[in-house]
Design a protein with these regions (language model features):
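Internal maturation/activation junctions in enzymes
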Residues: 1-58, 70-71, 78, 86-89, ...
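Short Gly/Pro-enriched turn/cap motifs at secondary-structure boundaries
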Residues: 31-35, 100-108, 193-196
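Short glycine-rich loop/turn motifs
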Residues: 37-42, 51, 110-115, 200-201
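Extended hydrophobic
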Residues: 46, 117-118, 124
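Active-site rim segments in enzyme catalytic domains, especially the processed small/beta chain
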Residues: 51-119, 149, 153
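Extended C-terminal subregions enriched in glycine
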Residues: 85, 106, 139, 148-196
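Alpha-helical support elements that line or immediately flank enzyme active sites
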Residues: 129-151
Length: 226
């Protein structure tokens, strides 16, 4: 609803309107609103050090399209995360093999990567993100940026992201990714594709003296404390 009533969306909808002449009603099409990738993530850390990192998903748009009677929630279509046939990609372009084939009593491969990093056996970094197959990359790079490159949680979350998943043979980068790095990669014959955003990473970090919670600026995410 927020998008539907926003000035930017309304201006886009009116961009082909000409008040000087009659239009053809058949030319009026539905608007396009960028939907999320159907995955949600949240982190919790309390004063006693109890930590929770939860990623939950419908997988595709509206999951399998079935609503649980009397409960009002949709069932997912995580079956797509199985390999229907070796070498055939799923809806996220991930190519599966025989090891991930559909079989009774088997759990499908999933990209969901809710993570809790311990320091001296105590929760230190609580992190996760939605984003389909890009999830492991975003979680990994965020952790590495904090631990190895000494970035603050906010810097690590909002730093331009990239992703590569073996197949398709492409490196996805956000539009604000370092152009020098892109040029260097292209010079080595890597194929680069730009995306408006990759993931929406959430982080809570407890350094012993202070707890920091960071919500990704890429979406309408939020962080709060008590």
């Amino acid at each position: 609803v927020k998008t539907l009533v926003s000035d930017s969306y309304l201006k886009k909808r009116m961009s082909d309107y000409d008040p000087s002449k009659a239009g053809n009603s058949k030319d009026v099409k539905e608007g396009y609103i960028q939907e999320g990738e159907e995955t949600t993530h949240f982190d919790v850390l309390d004063k006693d050090g109890n930590a929770v990192s939860v990623t939950t998903t419908l997988n595709g748009a509206f999951g399998c399209g079935i609503v649980v009677a009397g409960a009002g929630f949709l069932l997912n279509n995580e079956m797509d995360d199985f390999s229907v046939k070796p070498g055939v990609p799923n809806m996220f372009g991930a190519v599966g093999q025989e090891a991930n084939a559909i079989a009774p009593g088997k759990r499908m491969l999933s990209s969901m990567t809710p993570a809790i990093v311990l320091n001296n056996n105590k929760p230190w970094i609580v992190v996760g993100t939605p984003g389909g197959t890009t999830i492991p990359t975003s979680v990994y790079t965020t952790i590495v940026d904090i631990i190895d490159f000494k970035l603050t949680p906010e810097q690590a979350v909002n730093y331009p992201k990239f992703h590569q998943q073996w197949l398709p043979d492409v490196i996805y980068v956000e539009e604000n990714f370092n152009p020098t790095v892109i040029t260097q990669l292209e010079a080595m014959d890597y194929k680069i594709e730009k995306r408006s955003s990759i993931g929406r990473t959430e982080v809570i970090m407890d350094n012993g003296n202070m707890i920091t919670a960071v919500a990704d600026k890429r979406g309408d995410d939020g962080a709060s404390g008590y």
